[in-house]
Design a protein with these regions (language model features):
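Cleavable N-terminal export/targeting peptides
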Residues: 1-25, 205-208
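Short glycine/proline- and aromatic-enriched beta-strand/turn motifs that initiate or cap beta-hairpins
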Residues: 21-60, 200-208
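Residues that define the transmembrane beta-barrel architecture of outer-membrane proteins
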Residues: 24, 46-52, 95-99, 116, ...
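Membrane-spanning beta-strand positions in outer-membrane beta-barrel proteins
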Residues: 25-27, 57, 67, 104, ...
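Extended hydrophobic secondary-structure segments that form protein cores and membrane-embedded regions
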Residues: 28, 120-124, 168-171
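Gram-negative (and chloroplast) outer-membrane scaffold detector with strong preference
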Residues: 32, 59-135, 198-208
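Extracellular loop and loop/strand-boundary signature of outer-membrane beta-barrel proteins
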Residues: 40-44, 86-93, 136-142, 182-187
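Predominantly the C-terminal beta-signal and adjacent terminal strand-loop region
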Residues: 71, 76-82, 115, 147, ...
Length: 208
């Protein structure tokens, strides 16, 4: 838990410092997303698992067409799967909680001041595990503390009023590190994945 607070303090410091950069465009505010999460496993049938995130977001752009963004969010992830058994299907629900920090390199389309600006982005995503349950039992010891993945997305930013932006996008995230600890009973590579709709309301430091 102490490490969790240290991560939050460091990232808040980064956010505050970023607002003092000499670039022209900085927006910051709250972010929320929902979608489907899964863990890759070739021997199971995947079902829907609601994945939610909530936290803070900041975007910095030194010109009107390219920028960088970072979020600090709590994310619920995991999988809802079925495995064929002798007596029938075996249901397995894994719920993972992460402090997740996705970074984005963004390409903005259109011009600054347009009422709607489409965008595309890509970047890495880092996660720190804070909770894990398998079928409602605590299984945190079976999962690795750190996770990393890549994400890509498309979306649009809309001006609500002066300096207030509504940001929406659809993001696909694919893990690249095994989320489970290797053992004699588990030697497969299991990767996090998710598809989410992201919504954030951001305040800009520059008038349109």
């Amino acid at each position: 838990m102490k490490n969790y607070y240290n991560v939050i303090l460091i990232l808040l410091l980064i956010i505050v410092t970023s607002q003092k950069l000499s670039g022209q465009y900085v927006t910051f505010g709250r972010a929320f997303s929902f979608g489907d999460a899964f863990i890759t496993d070739k021997d199971v049938t995947h079902g829907f698992l609601l994945s939610l995130t909530g936290g803070l977001s900041i975007t910095y752009a030194d010109n009107e067409h390219y920028g960088f963004a970072a979020d600090v969010v709590y994310a619920t992830e995991g999988s809802n799967s079925k495995t064929a058994g002798v007596a029938g299907d075996i249901q397995n629900k894994i719920k993972l909680g992460y402090i997740r920090i996705p970074f984005k390199y963004i390409r903005f389309l259109g011009e600054y001041g347009d009422p709607i600006r489409p965008k595309i982005f890509v970047g890495p995503s880092f996660g720190y595990l804070v909770s894990a349950e398998t079928n409602k039992e605590n299984t945190k010891a079976e999962f690795n503390k750190f996770d990393m993945g890549l994400h890509i997305g498309v979306g649009a930013n809309k001006i609500i009023c002066d300096r207030i932006w509504l940001n929406t996008d659809i993001t696909y995230t694919q893990g690249i590190l095994d989320v489970t600890k290797q053992s004699q009973n588990n030697n497969e590579i299991n990767l996090n994945g998710s598809v989410r709709l992201n919504i954030s309301l951001l305040l800009g430091t520059k008038r349109k």
